[in-house]
Amino acid sequence: MTMPLQIYNTTRRELAESVLTEVVTTVLQEEGFLIESLVAVYCGNKMIHRINREFLGHDYPTDTITFSYSKGSEIDGEFYISLDAVEENALRYKVGFDEELMRVTIHSALHLAGYQDGKDEERVQMQEKEALYLKRFVTPST
């Protein structure tokens, strides 16, 4: 029997896969979706750059790429997250790696739930949702 959510880590960095599973599942359930089939791949810049170039025509690495094949309220899709980009973002935004990893994972799940970030108003709505979910999963560092 296959699992509805499969997580693959192609890097040497250790990840708390059970926490990532909980984050993705919670976001999608609370947005009104069930996971039919979802693959989450945590990779490096080299892999995500290749995917970005081949499938989206963008010749640069990015933090996340999401592909949705969903119909209705059942999620069928995949997302890729570059841990190199997550690390760069964490330094840029002066947050911990784990917090930024949660944010990008939430961001990916929100894309699967239909949220977009191409326009300013869409980006603001998505950032508000990210902040809402992030508060639940990240303990503020003091």
From Swiss-Prot:
UniProt binding sites for Zn(2+): 107, 111, 117
Family annotation (Gene3D superfamilies): Metalloproteases ('zincins'), catalytic domain
Any one GO molecular function term: metalloendopeptidase activity
Keywords noted in UniProt: Cytoplasm, Endonuclease, Hydrolase, Metal-binding, Nuclease, Ribosome biogenesis, rRNA processing, Zinc
Protein name: Endoribonuclease YbeY
UniProt superkingdom: Bacteria
Names of required cofactors: Zn(2+)
Keyword rRNA processing set for record: yes
Entries under NCBIfam families matching the protein: rRNA maturation RNase YbeY
Compartments it resides in: Cytoplasm
The encoding gene: ybeY
Main location group: cytoplasm
PROSITE patterns (alphabetical): UPF0054
Keyword rRNA processing among UniProt keywords: yes
SUPFAM superfamilies, alphabetized: Metalloproteases ('zincins'), catalytic domain (SSF55486)
UniProt cofactor note: Binds 1 zinc ion.
Cystine crosslinks: none
GO biological process, one term: rRNA processing
